[in-house]
Every structure is written in structure tokens, then in C-alpha cells.
UniProtKB/Swiss-Prot annotation:
A Pfam family recorded for this sequence: STG
Subcellular location: Secreted, Extracellular space, Extracellular matrix
Name used for this protein in its record: Uncharacterized protein C6orf15 homolog
Taxonomy, superkingdom: Eukaryota
Main localization, broad class: secreted
Region feature Disordered, mapped onto this chain: 41-110, 148-189
Keywords: Extracellular matrix, Secreted, Signal
Organism in which the protein naturally occurs: Pan troglodytes
GO biological process: extracellular matrix organization
Annotated Polar residues bias: 41-60
Oligomer status and interactors: Binds to numerous extracellular matrix proteins.
InterPro entries: C6orf15 (IPR026135)
A cellular-component GO term for this protein: extracellular matrix
């Protein structure tokens, strides 16, 4: 019985502990935040008051401020003009008056600011330094021609008449600009003296994009023109022509110009499709000499159509209907001689 009661109470106690844990955590976090805010309020010095030394300060010593740190030096200072009568303004000794020499105030007299605001101001200061430097370089490159004025790095005569504070800021910017020029080396000096605007002006004005020679048109095939052009050996020829001499017709493959379309003879003036060596033959004539009739395949002209004898006027030595293949003696009757030449064909 007691075991059952203990088993039922254990989950209940665990549930109560889980419900109380968030409240305990919230209380502990709130106490820590209050302590941190109190420590920050006591550690930050007020304007015109020295830092109080007490047990809280001894327990949490303040870090010493480095006057050479870039972040603190780049924080914009809130300068206030001194009154003309020399008396301090309203507020008593809480507001410190600037000395007549316009020097920087002491570190202890700076007003307390939020660290996030200080970081944002430092970032804006860096961005403002980078942008005017580039803009000044571009404006000097456009406005000043080579040899017409001083370089961007040289000091202008207006800088001599500036106030001491402005001169200090100018020296600070010059000291920050020196490492960049040293890292660039001789190339940086060349770029600063002769900016790359000449190359852009050679490409952009008065001639198409991509050409570096303004006197030559784009795509003309000569030197200095655009890519992808192939010069033609004979520009006066017609498109598709393959002959070396210009002026021939399209598709002419003769060695000499003036022939008709499709003529493959060596000499011009022949008819279409003539394959004879000499002109004047009829269409389809394949004899060696002109003058033969159509279909004549004899060696000498004058024979009739279908004549297959070597010489004209010679009859067939065999009777009609006798088959005699060339170069063989089968199917030939007895008593007949073999043909005199193996070149004879069927009758």
C-alpha cells in the first residue's frame, strides 16, 4: 500500500518541480541584469566629474583608455564655439569650455555615450573616408589631363590656409592613405598618374564596340578589326565561286572563263554534255574523231548504226543466228575458223 502511494506521489512532485523551475530562472536572470545595470551606471564617468573611487570601482576596475586607438580617434567630436565674452555658458562647470588653441580635450572630459553608437559612428567614419577618397581620384582623373596640374597626392595651396584642426585631420587621412599606396607599389603610382580612362575613350567614342582602331571599320577583315573575320583572296568574285580568275559564272569549274554551264571540256565553245577531246561533235558522240553518227562506237567514222566491225565494208563471216562469244570456241560449227580478234562482240 505504501509503495503505491509513493509511486503516485513521485510524478506529482516531479511535475511541481518542473513548474517552479522557469520562475526561479527568471528571478535569477532579473537579479543579474539589475546588478549589471547598476555597475554600468556607477562605472561610467559623468561630464566634468572625476571618476569616483569606491568598493564598486575596486571590485570592477575600469580599463585604461588608449589615446592611440583608431576607433576612439575616429569618433566625431561635438565641437562647440566658445562664447565671445569669455564667460562659461549656462550649466556651470559641468560643461568644459574649449581652450583658445582649439586643441583636443582630455579623455576624462568626453561625454558618456552608448558603445553601440560609438561603433556605428566609427563605421560611418570609415565609409565616409573610403568614398571621398575614390571620388576624389575619379574627379581628378576626369578633370585634370596628364601634365596639366598636380597629382591627387600633392598638396594644394588651399591646404596651407586651413585651421590647425583641419590640418591635423588632413595629416591623419594622408597617414592612412600611405600604406595603401605602398602596398600597390610602382603599379599604384602609374595608375595614380595615368588613370585607365584613355583605354575606355579608345573603345567607346565614334566607332563600334570592340574595335581598337577607329580608322578601320568593324568586320572588314584587316588588322585591328573585330574577331571572326576571314579575308577573301579575290573580293570581286561572286558568292560561291571557286575559280581563281574573277568574273566567271556561278558553278563554272573550267580552267578558262567563258564556258557554258556544266561544261567540263578543256576548251570553251563546246555544246552541253560533250565529252569529246575536240569540239564540233554531236551529242553523245564518244568517238575519238568527230563526224560519226549517233551511237557509233567504231574506231573510224562512216560506219552505220550498230556496226561493230573493225573496218567498214566487212561482212560477218558467220551465218546469221550463230552465237559466238568473244575469245571462245563453244557453240561454233565444225569447219569455221576462230574469230581473228577477241574484241569482237555479239552479232
Amino acid at each position: 500500500m505504501q509503495g503505491r502511494v509513493a509511486g503516485s506521489c513521485a510524478p506529482l512532485g516531479l511535475l511541481l518541480v518542473c513548474l517552479h523551475l522557469p520562475g526561479l530562472f527568471a528571478r535569477s536572470i532579473g537579479v543579474v541584469e539589475e546588478k549589471v545595470s547598476q555597475n554600468l551606471g556607477t562605472n561610467l564617468p559623468q561630464l566634468g566629474q572625476p571618476s569616483s573611487t569606491g568598493p564598486s570601482n575596486s571590485e570592477h576596475p575600469q580599463p585604461a583608455l588608449d589615446p592611440r586607438s583608431n576607433d576612439l580617434a575616429r569618433v566625431p567630436l561635438k565641437l562647440s564655439a566658445p562664447p565671445s565674452d569669455g564667460f562659461p555658458p549656462a550649466g556651470g562647470s559641468a560643461v568644459q569650455r574649449w581652450p583658445p588653441s582649439w586643441g583636443l580635450p582630455a579623455m576624462d572630459s568626453w561625454p558618456p555615450e552608448d558603445p553601440w553608437q560609438m561603433m556605428a559612428a566609427a563605421a560611418e567614419d570609415r565609409l565616409g573616408e573610403a568614398l571621398p577618397e575614390e571620388l576624389s581620384y575619379l574627379s581628378s582623373a576626369v578633370a585634370l589631363a596628364p601634365g596639366s596640374g598636380p597629382l591627387p597626392g600633392e598638396s594644394s595651396p588651399d591646404a596651407t590656409g586651413l585651421s590647425p584642426e583641419a590640418s591635423l585631420l588632413h595629416q591623419d587621412s594622408e597617414s592612412r592613405r600611405l600604406p595603401r599606396s605602398n602596398s600597390l607599389g610602382a603599379g599604384g603610382k602609374i595608375l595614380s598618374q595615368r588613370p585607365p580612362w584613355s583605354l575606355i575613350h579608345r573603345v567607346l567614342p565614334d566607332h563600334p564596340w570592340g574595335t581598337l582602331n577607329p580608322s578601320v571599320s568593324w568586320g572588314g577583315g584587316g588588322p585591328g578589326t573585330g574577331w571572326g573575320t576571314r579575308p577573301m583572296p579575290h573580293p570581286e568574285g561572286i558568292w560561291g565561286i571557286n575559280n581563281q580568275p574573277p568574273g566567271t559564272s556561278w558553278g563554272n569549274i573550267n580552267r578558262y572563263p567563258g564556258g557554258s554551264w556544266g561544261n567540263i571540256n578543256r576548251y570553251p565553245g563546246d555544246s552541253w554534255g560533250n565529252n569529246n577531246r575536240y569540239p564540233g561533235g554531236s551529242w553523245g558522240n564518244i568517238n575519238r574523231y568527230p563526224g560519226g553518227s549517233w551511237g557509233n562506237i567504231n574506231r573510224y567514222p562512216g560506219g552505220s548504226w550498230g556496226n561493230i566491225h573493225l573496218y567498214p565494208g566487212i561482212n560477218n563471216p558467220f551465218p546469221p543466228g550463230v552465237l559466238r562469244p568473244p575469245g571462245s570456241s563453244w557453240n561454233i560449227p565444225a569447219g569455221f575458223p576462230n574469230p581473228p580478234s577477241p574484241r569482237l562482240q555479239w552479232g
